[in-house]
Amino acid sequence: MDEIGGDGRQGEYRRQKKEHIPFIYIRQRYEKLLFPRFSLAYNLLICPMSYNSLRTSKNINKTKFIRLMKTFRLLIVALLLAGSASAQRYERRAMRGEYSPTVYLISVQEVDTIYNYGPYAMQQAAVLNRMAMDNATQDYIETHRPGFQQVEKPQFVFATKNNLFSFSLGGFVSLRAGYDFDGIVDNIDFVTYDIPVHGSYDTRQKLMMDASTSRLFMKAITNTRALGRVVVFMDADFRGGAEGSYTPRLRSAYVSFLGFTLGRDVTTFCDLSAAPTTIDFQGPNAYNFNFATMIRYEYAFADNHLKFGVAAEMPSVSGTYNDNFATLKQRVPDFPAYFQYAWGANRDSHIRASGVVRNMYLHNLRTGNNTSLLGWGVQFSGTIKVAQPLRLFMNGVYGKGVTPYIQDLTGSGLDFTPNPENADQIQTMPMWGWQAAAQINLTPRLFISGGYSTVRVQRSHGFYSDDQYKQGQYIFGNIFYSITPRCKVAGEYLYGSRKDMSNDKGHANRVNVMLQYSF
């Protein structure tokens, strides 16, 4: 009897045969249950690896060869098990409309595979795998941040079985098409500041198609003893260069733990849930969605009814200089803070009070001295779920020298201007804005929304120039429909106007459509 070389090695043969029996039993018992789509793969890759095929010549290191075949076999089984289990799990939850990403469990230890398990142990392993998938899914549910221009929860998650680390990739492809008529906006987004006041033959109609708002994001979650849950997030779009260049742009890049956020994120002054959903990438002109590099701390208490946050953020100053003043590098961060009260079963309604204080430095060429101006702003914002189908959004802001915190005025040069009555002096400009909108959910897949927004720059000792921005108005109405949980289409109408200090006025109309697919 030639049992893998003979020569008294029957014991080794028995051990190898005994090790092989559970795998054959598992494959025959559970193949149809776990791997209905992979039977051909088993027949081609697994069956030829029975112990009879291991009969080789005596000069081959049989033990190493057996271990190599076992490792190869284990790898295939583990991959098929992960793919089948996560696919079945996704199908069950997707039918119920729940968040159900495809979770791939990562393991490099042989004891974690099903090869060494009997039928009962294999059932226990399957239960543990499902628990690991549920824990990873729960991590992404609890750390998801909804709101204006925020990404959806990821569809693909890679996680360790001990739930210490998980990693996900995702994004969406978005195509926007728009047509301006009876006046245009000199911007791919509907920025009322950029509406030409004195039109010409070239400012009557305009066609646009844009995919630069498509998004890619990466998110990693680590559960630690010392720092608790650590979240690393990065996302990017293609708005980094001139219009139509599709240059990649880093939007956010931060790490958060124990209430701290370190890196680049949406400014703390912004209430992400206070703005409606729009096809227009800019959104209401009185909103304040801008990015900043920051150190932020947030804390929720009273069963998440109350929350506050405070931050130090890199300043962005945009002023108007004359011959007596020059730019100067900034020396003090902006300090935004907020306090929020939330209610509802999921704390899905809230009101928030926010404030920001900033110091803006510039150089006085006439005196040769450096000087600074104090800027400040306050805001009231929130979202309220009035009834099951109806939700309201609003924010109102007032301040001096706070153009980074009012979208229509960002980069406008209106943080400060020379005093019209005394060119040797410079002054911060008072400004305010507000927006209100409503969303009606007609069905779980279909909603309509509409709203109004306005921004105003007040005069201070008169005005600096006739063409200085005075007021902008933004009106919108749209409809969104989700064809599938990952694919949605939308249509939108926008009207906007701009008025200068001279009371000259221009207006524009735009129709937008959008197709977006998330992955």
Please state what every model-predicted region is:
Residues 23-25, 29-92:
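Bacterial Sec-dependent N-terminal signal peptides
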Residues 87-181:
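N-terminal periplasmic/intermembrane-space "pro-region" immediately following the signal or transit peptide
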Residues 160-187, 201-318, 336, 340-343, ...:
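Outer membrane beta-barrel
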Residues 165, 205-214, 247-251, 256, ...:
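Residues that define the transmembrane beta-barrel architecture of outer-membrane proteins
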Residues 183-188, 243-250, 273-280, 319-327, ...:
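Outer-membrane beta-barrel translocator domains and adjoining extracellular loop/strand segments
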Residues 229-240, 310-314, 354-359, 447-460, ...:
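Transmembrane beta-strand segments that form the barrel wall of outer-membrane beta-barrel proteins
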Residues 346-462, 469:
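Detector for outer-membrane/organellar transmembrane beta-barrel domains
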Residues 481-483, 507-519:
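Outer-membrane beta-barrel "beta-signal"
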